[in-house]
Amino acid sequence: GISSLHDMESLPFTYSEDIAGFPSRFLCIPQKYVKRIVTLKTSGTSGTEKRIFFTEHDLSMTVDFFTNGFKAMVDENDRVMIMMPGNTYGSVGRIIKKSLDHLNIRNFIYGPLKNSDDAADFIAKNNINTLVAMPVQTMILSRIKKSVFLQNIKRVMLSADYVPEILIKKLKRLRTIHMHYLL
């Protein structure tokens, strides 16, 4: 058994191949308690996808985590456009929405960028001043719809993927940037 920190040395190390090859072996609860399963392909690699399981408690704790993080980023005067997937239960977009709802921040799940004209119209129509988006989407929107971006967007939270330093530098010239890696 494990009764001290020293005992932890006897446990085998977990490699990404273990999680990819045998995801259900990492479940410590009955499967009936799993509320969301996320399949992840690690950014920048061609490795095998990994399946991660979440309970209702895990999802709730994630909402709480983001609620606390957003307290430092937005206030009741902000209007946030969530450019993350949000169609399914426990999705990133819905978790962010719940977090912002807890703070009474007006927010909209827009979803991933598909059309820059539509996104720019959405920003203008809804008086959006804050984006939560993936880095590449933000870069595309800020270049193609620069005037709408400059007139409306005060801050951006870049998330869900690696953020290249060059993108941070370019966007910092335009806006306040926050970064966070999430599922």
Positions of PLM-derived features:
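Short, aromatic/basic amphipathic alpha-helical patches
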Residues: 95-100, 146, 167-174
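Conserved S/T- and glycine-rich ATP-binding loop of Class I adenylate-forming
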Residues: 42-45, 80, 131, 156
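Nucleotide 5′-phosphate-binding alpha/beta core
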Residues: 1-41, 47-61, 68
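Short, conserved loop/helix-junction motifs that constitute active-site signature segments
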Residues: 147-152
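Short helix-loop-beta connector
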Residues: 74-78
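Gly/Ser/Thr-rich phosphate-binding loop
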Residues: 153-183
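AMP-binding/adenylate-forming
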Residues: 56-69, 79-139
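Phosphate/pyrophosphate-binding betaalpha-module
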Residues: 140-144
